[in-house]
Amino acid sequence: MSFVVIIPARFASTRLPGKPLLDINGKPMIVHVLERARESGAERIIVATDHEDVARAVEAAGGEVCMTRADHQSGTERLAEVVEKCGFSDDTVIVNVQGDEPMIPAVIIRQVAENLAQRQVGMATLAAPVHSAEEAFNPNVVKVVLDSEGYALYFSRATIPWDRDRFAKGLETVGDNFLRHLGIYGYRAGFIRRYVNWQPSPLEHIEMLEQLRVLWYGEKIHVAVAEQVPGTGVDTAEDLERVRAEMR
């Protein structure tokens, strides 16, 4: 099947300035992400950035760049600019791979594209089982609950679903009822065009989760369990050191 990968790579980062260019074992982080995307079999891979230094690093590695505005409020807005500049047809399958995921398995990039292509829905994503209480109660780990057909009912930083009987006995263990959301998305290009014209939703602002806008407006998001759980993403200096060690 045919799909396009777009990798948003914003240069400014509060915790890690210049994050896309941080060195991981001799290569800029963004180049590692580009290489994972190439392994997925995508027809076309585009790095969307607002910074010339990132563009030069990607082009030096043989990658394609689309320069975007610096004032986007979200990664999806940056994707929308690329979709318009490239003139993708509404039915083009687009996979959004985060620029700070140098250890993302190529197999799940393709998985989310295939899941979307097989369904009459505008958006798809992935999740992974939660096995520890630490994850279940961590607000930085986004949980998702699904309906009987694998469509998202809700995403939350809260512990959902709340296991009333188990948690009444203590919060040390969790059962098999929890899924954590993975930050990889597949979209049809036409859906991206519609999405950016919707006003942000109240729930989106409360949880600070952009995908809640989709549910607020009555659209469906298909969620599959990832065939392979991705490694550490890079949000902090500690994450960076961990990734460097794991990728040696």
Swiss-Prot record:
Enzyme category, top tier: transferase
UniProt keyword annotation of Transferase present: yes
Subcellular localization: Cytoplasm
Gene3D superfamilies: Spore Coat Polysaccharide Biosynthesis Protein SpsA, Chain A
Transmembrane segments: none
Pfam families reported for this sequence: CTP_transf_3
Enzyme nomenclature, EC number: 2.7.7.38
GO function term, MF aspect, one: 3-deoxy-manno-octulosonate cytidylyltransferase activity
Chemical reaction(s) catalysed: 3-deoxy-alpha-D-manno-oct-2-ulosonate + CTP = CMP-3-deoxy-beta-D-manno-octulosonate + diphosphate
Pathway note: Nucleotide-sugar biosynthesis; CMP-3-deoxy-D-manno-octulosonate biosynthesis; CMP-3-deoxy-D-manno-octulosonate from 3-deoxy-D-manno-octulosonate and CTP: step 1/1; Bacterial outer membrane biogenesis; lipopolysaccharide biosynthesis
UniProtKB keywords: Cytoplasm, Lipopolysaccharide biosynthesis, Nucleotidyltransferase, Transferase
Keyword Transferase: yes
One GO term of the biological process aspect: lipopolysaccharide biosynthetic process
GO annotation, cellular component aspect: cytosol
Alphabetical list of InterPro entries matching this protein: Cytidylyl_trans, KdsB, Nucleotide-diphossugar_trans
Taxonomic superkingdom: Bacteria
Role this protein plays: Activates KDO (a required 8-carbon sugar) for incorporation into bacterial lipopolysaccharide in Gram-negative bacteria.
Family note: Belongs to the KdsB family.
Name this polypeptide is given: 3-deoxy-manno-octulosonate cytidylyltransferase
Organism lineage: Bacteria, Pseudomonadati, Pseudomonadota, Gammaproteobacteria, Enterobacterales
